[in-house]
């Protein structure tokens, strides 16, 4: 297992220092005892670890309602970090409220109203404006990015309790009702899962009854790819990490912040142990010495559920390698694998330059197997039938020449939004008609996002294109996390593209100029009644070519889709094939 020296060495770079003039010492006010008590309570009796900084910050804010300057200073002292290091981490993440000396704390209750694609189409922006005047000064109303419940738009979160299909009356009632926590979902728990045959495959792999190479071969034959968005072949990733020197680590990404995506939430709410078993199989086959699970802060009930079920797994098998559950803090960029690793290490979630890749130099400087939750969820269903000689329920599916199953998060102007598990290669028209009950009454298909905000936009005339990895590139789009956002003749593609670009500008980590400046500049230019097509095209090309990570590289996609498929909306010359919105 990785030791504390390795953890510290991999967690943060060496510290430089400057000589300070002896006759000009820096003076600081002594910390009050209450600040040290608050920091000590946040540590909860643990040996202080710099990589757990974000968790300590969460505990401070959970207890005190905000991050007060004295508390941050005391926490830095306890962790033996510079105050600036703690401050830069706390100020990076959107969910932390820093209160400087002399400033007033925020109201005790915050209502967060989603304004991302699906919720904006359902009136989320107007809802936020209404609540800001209705709820009074003792409640803070924030407009926030996607909260992962797009199938129930619009959504407001009162404290930590989501109000689905929200309106001003239902949110006001939730505020008055006083309940602030979301109840645990009715998921399949450990005892029920094990009684139905769960964990038998993992035990067979662990005992050596089933060889690791056999498991990898089954994944290879099924064609399982990373289902968080990148689509990298899972079997190849397992082989690559297994070939690296020990200790090897594992990071699981449940930070599904892509607007329109909620499939991982669905799987955790219904059958979390299928994912946990897949994770344990992967860990054994690859030779993993420690596992870190990173779940988005917007899913507090799922975090509590997962923590409890992991405790039951540890109780059943006490000799498991360490498994740590970490929560994010509202940074979309931490869905990128290297930014997530930086966050797990207790730092700002800023993507790393590559190479080296995380499979070689990842978490705490060690080779790291990184996977999305859904990828691991399918492992048992692929491997068990393959070993039994039966048909593979994953690879035997598919249409239009594609292979496998996909979990589509469908939202927008359809009658029945939700997670649809169906054939890879299905078309948008087939998906909506066969699984979503068609369009809402009175609505006609005008266009859709095939892969969330970053996946670009396609017009209705391209509703018969197969939806899968590698099928949408010719149209300047990609499937990504398979977040399908459907819009109708009552929507404007340009407004949705502006929404997406403002989201990317808000979520840019700021590390590289093409993304930091490019998203902000594009968002400004896109507000003009007539777009400057040449300038926006040049700006988008620069962002795609020069940005460090996928955020800046994909941010121009919706903008470029409007120029290509909906030029009539932005005063750009071109044939109007889509019909006026």
Feature roles, as predicted:
Residues 193-200, 252-264, 358-363, 409-414:
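Gly-rich Lys/Arg/Thr-decorated short loops/hinges at beta-loop-alpha junctions or inter-strand turns
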Residues 158-160, 411-417, 450-451:
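Short strand-turn-strand beta-turns centered on an Asx-Gly dipeptide
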Residues 205-244, 393-396, 409, 421-422, ...:
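Accessory "access/gating" subregions that flank catalytic or transport cores
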Residues 174-221, 371-394:
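Flexible inter-domain linker/hinge segments
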Residues 278-282, 424-441:
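Short amphipathic, charge-patterned alpha-helical segments
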Residues 93, 271-285:
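Histidine-anchored nucleotide/phosphate-binding helix
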Residues 303-424, 436:
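Hydrophobic alpha-helical positions that pack around
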Residues 17, 21-111, 115-147, 151-180, ...:
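Ferredoxin-type iron-sulfur electron-transfer modules in oxidoreductases and energy-metabolism complexes
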